[in-house]
UniProtKB/Swiss-Prot annotation:
Alpha(8)-beta(8). The alpha component is a flavoprotein, the beta component is a hemoprotein. GO terms for molecular function: 4 iron, 4 sulfur cluster binding; heme binding; metal ion binding; NADP binding; sulfite reductase (ferredoxin) activity; sulfite reductase (NADPH) activity. Its EC number is 1.8.1.2. PROSITE patterns: NIR_SIR. It is an enzyme of class 1 (oxidoreductase). Binds 1 siroheme per subunit. Binds 1 [4Fe-4S] cluster per subunit. Siroheme binds at C486. Belongs to the nitrite and sulfite reductase 4Fe-4S domain family. Its cofactor is siroheme; [4Fe-4S] cluster. This is Sulfite reductase [NADPH] hemoprotein beta-component. [4Fe-4S] cluster binds at C437, C443, C482, C486. It catalyses: hydrogen sulfide + 3 NADP(+) + 3 H2O = sulfite + 3 NADPH + 4 H(+).
């Protein structure tokens, strides 16, 4: 196909494009806004820029109406997200994050579905101190949000530790090498002096340019048989290919993404498609050139159609592949065979190479805090004080106390026991396979509860599960407070998307290994109807399933929902 069809959609640039253009490479008036003493918030333009620095301005929506009555501004606060490729933290970094959450945040840490930390409830006056403390722990928040490449994920379960280590190094290299080059972050938060003069755009941002990307860009690397990072949900996914215990390269998959807009069929979740294979040393080149295609041809006019998945679907998979190979100057090899078995975590102790041990722990909703009857945050703090390995955050909002020496295993096991930290074995497998986004009260986009509500809903679903002998049956269940899809709802065998307070669209039929999207089953229903539907479907699954048949496969075979064969027919 000729180059004549390679163009971005026409239309005036969105307001965010104007903000980026006028921002002097993400500086804007952020420095001044953060010093403004009369408001705990910042201007809308600066908030759009703030994302690229790893933060969103939010307010406590539980307090919104009361504050309006009192004629007060909203209870503004900031969410801060750390850039932590592959979800790997040292015990020392864990202790710093723990302390900052208690000192400046709301006393909790959120483990995200992209393997990093979020802190909520930080006041404007404490932001700079918090970011500087994170920096002193050899971490940062650069590009954790915004129209750039986000936190690079990789499979965290350390069964193949040597392979995992290599894959982690590649994810770290990608994350570091694809960072924006502007010094705005260092000047605003770390008091670096601005260099005088006006350098050329290609000096400041050789890859991104002055407008950065049309929308966020997500990369993840999976190591089969685990698809815990949901590689097909990424804008750019890499699937590690291992032969004779050696990493020989990666299959390349492009064009995934979960977000959509209620009522707009031109928006939809989509799965990345495998287009070929590259060697490890070609990985960065493939990533960089793919990003530049999105930079040049993505939609800068309509933000809800600006993700790379829409660029791929609009131009055509083959066209994008050809353009990628054009820019690379070489062709991708043919994709290699691979096999995924699941996209969940494997819990409990497992022994890796070199006599090291790893404990995968269930953290419901990814929320690390101290409850009245469960001192989770304190327990993890005490473990971090004695642990000499690392701590890995998983894409399912759990964590792994990893690389534990045989000498330390006894002490760490005692602390796990003392604080009741759990591998989730006494819960149903469905609860262990659940994830939820933050939603209310802090997320400004949420239309309904998610993290605060899903555990209570599962309490009731568990009764149906246990009555039907399904306690040990892994069924992935995911809930998001809005259609943006942070908890990857469209890849849950049972998925819920918030529509209004207490109301959800219910989806069924995603694949257990993350290779098929779900289909809407019921629209705008509340708890009573959700439970009524599951009281009908789960007993049927228990009685009628074939041996080894997964719930997501069963509901399609039984005709309960149609199969979604591609994101473009998600709404059919």
């Amino acid at each position: 196909m000729g180059n004549e069809i390679l163009k971005a959609p026409e239309g005036p640039p969105s307001d965010v494009e104007r903000i980026k253009k006028e921002s002097d490479y993400l500086r804007g008036t952020l420095k001044e806004s953060m010093l403004e003493p009369l408001s705990a918030g910042i201007s809308d333009d600066d908030n759009r820029l703030m994302k690229h620095h790893g933060s969103y301005l939010q307010d406590d929506r539980d307090l919104r109406n009361e504050r309006q009555k009192q004629k007060l501004e909203p209870a503004y606060q900031f969410m801060l997200r750390v850039r932590m490729p592959g979800g790997v933290a040292t015990p020392e970094q864990w202790l710093v994050m723990d302390e900052l959450a208690r000192k400046y945040g709301n006393g909790t840490l959120k483990l995200t579905t992209r393997e990093t930390f979020q802190m909520h409830g930080i006041l404007k006056w404490n932001m700079k101190k918090t970011i500087q403390s994170i920096h002193s722990a050899m971490l940062d928040t650069i590009a954790a949000c915004g129209d750039v490449n986000r936190n690079v994920m990789c499979t965290s379960n350390p069964y193949q530790s040597e392979i995992h280590r290599e894959v982690y190094e590649w994810s770290k290299k990608l994350s570091d090498d694809l960072l924006p080059r502007t010094r705005a972050y260092h000047e605003i938060w770390l008091d670096e002096e601005k260099v005088a003069g006006t350098p050329d755009a290609d000096e400041v941002e050789p890859m991104y340019g002055p407008l950065y990307l049309p929308r966020k860009f997500k990369i993840g690397i999976a190591v089969p048989p685990s698809n815990d990072i949901d590689v097909f949900s990424q804008d750019l996914g890499f699937i590690a290919i291992v032969e004779d215990d050696k990493l020989i390269g990666f299959n390349v998959a492009i064009g995934g993404g979960m977000g959509m807009t209620h009522g707009d069929k031109a928006t939809y979740p989509q799965l990345a498609k495998v287009i070929g294979f590259c060697k490890p040393e070609q990985l960065y080149d493939v990533a960089e050139k793919t990003i530049t295609i999105q930079r040049d041809y993505g939609n800068r006019s309509v933000r809800k159609n600006a993700r790379f998945k829409y660029t791929v679907d609009r131009l055509g998979l083959e066209t994008v592949k050809n353009e990628l190979e054009n820019r690379l100057g070489w062709s991708l090899a043919e994709a290699k065979p691979y096999h995924f078995e699941h996209n969940g975590d494997r819990y409990g102790w497992v022994k890796g190479v070199k006599g090291r041990w790893h404990f995968t722990m269930f953290v419901e909703g990814g929320r690390v805090t101290d409850y009245d009857d469960y001192k989770l945050m304190t327990g993890l703090r005490e473990i971090a004080k004695v642990h000499t390995g690392d701590i890995r955050l998983t894409a399912n909002q759990n964590l792994i106390i990893a690389n534990v020496t045989s000498q330390k295993k006894k002490k760490i096991s005692e602390l796990i026991e003392q604080f009741g930290l759990t591998d989730g074995k006494h819960y149903t497998a469905l609860r262990r396979s659940s994830i939820a986004c933050v939603a209310l009260p802090t997320c400004g986009l949420a239309m309904a509860e998610a993290e605060r509500y899903l555990p209570k809903l599962i309490d009731k679903i568990d009764e149906i599960v246990e009555e039907n002998g399904l306690k040990n049956e892994e069924i992935t269940i995911r809930m998001t407070g809005c259609p943006n899809g942070c908890a990857r709802h469209a890849l849950g065998e049972i998925g819920f998307i918030g529509k209004a307070p207490g109301k959800y669209n219910m989806y069924l039929g995603a694949a257990f290994d993350g290779s098929r999207l779900s289909k809407m089953y019921r629209e705008n229903i509340g708890e009573e109807e959700i439970l009524k539907e599951l009281r009908n479907i789960l007993p049927r699954y228990a009685k009628e399933r074939n041996e080894g048949e997964r719930f997501g496969d069963f509901v399609i075979r039984a005709g309960i929902v149609k199969e979604t064969t591609d994101g473009t027919n998600f709404h059919d």
